[in-house]
Amino acid sequence: MDELKKLAGVTAAKYVKNGMIVGLGTGSTAYFFVEEIGRRVKEEGLQVVGVTTSNRTTEQARGLGIPLKSADDIDVIDVTVDGADEVDPDFNGIKGGGGALLMEKIVATPTKEYIWVVDESKLVETLGAFKLPVEVVRYGSERLFRVFKSKGYCPSFRETEGDRFITDMGNYIIDLDLKKIEDPKQLANELDHTVGVVEHGLFNSMVNKVIVAGKNGLDILEK
């Protein structure tokens, strides 16, 4: 599957042209996209400016010699390529399994052409089997946890090596084990209006193309 993920990443890189501002995604498939952009910068003289979606991707891009700018310094991104944890037939998705959902959404929002690269296991009829990440400020997070629990959202604080996971922005993540999300837009609206929630992993109707790596090769889905 790694070879197919690599092929998906390389294919996505073909949408990147000279002079573009490019959003550089995070995750196992987006990794290959960033690697290919780095190769083209070095070997073909590709001239682009990258905007990264995580500290991990920043380190990768710098190591490859890709020029970078902060999201603060740009108004429009030409193309962003990123991964996703689930994608439904309406191009709604869940992201944030790697913990970078806030930066990913900040980069996705001003993007003209937003592309996801995924393997075929990420295509689902209904979102929710993958736990929905919700990034929350630390202050009041225990109360917020109880609110989610009272709603039957089966929350859990994300942990790493026995300690609470802390995002690149210094926040906690509460994962919601919802099993099935019948109305992603309604849930997104609810979370958007919940005090203490910084961002959530529902990316509804944001993506333009999904490049799918499957056992039979690549499939490019478009709206």
Swiss-Prot record:
Reactions the enzyme catalyzes: aldehydo-D-ribose 5-phosphate = D-ribulose 5-phosphate
Cite the EC number.
5.3.1.6
Residues binding substrate: 26-29, 82-85, 95-98, 122
Q: Which UniProt keywords apply?
A: Isomerase
Query: Which ranges form a coiled coil?
Result: none
Query: Where, by residue number, is the active site?
Result: 104
Q: Which HAMAP family match?
A: Rib_5P_isom_A
The record's subunit annotation is: Homodimer.
Which family, according to the similarity comment? Belongs to the ribose 5-phosphate isomerase family.
State what protein this is by name: Ribose-5-phosphate isomerase A
Q: From which organism does this entry originate?
A: Streptococcus agalactiae serotype III (strain NEM316)
Species lineage = Bacteria, Bacillati, Bacillota, Bacilli, Lactobacillales
The gene name reads: rpiA
